[in-house]
From Swiss-Prot:
Residue ranges, compositional bias (Basic residues): 31-44
Cited InterPro entries: Ribosomal_bL34, Ribosomal_bL34_CS
Coiled coil start-end: none
GO cellular component: ribonucleoprotein complex; ribosome
Keywords: Ribonucleoprotein, Ribosomal protein
GO biological-process terms attached to the record: translation
Protein name from the UniProt record: Large ribosomal subunit protein bL34
Amino acid sequence: MKRTFQPSTLKRARTHGFRARMATKNGRQVLSRRRAKGRKRLTV
């Protein structure tokens, strides 16, 4: 059985990247929450 995590930088950026977050209203909410919390990295 193969492992479930097969890392791909491009897929990772497209689903969890900054532009992906900015594309939707909820994604922008995620960013604002992370800013409020003081996260060093907002996205991947």
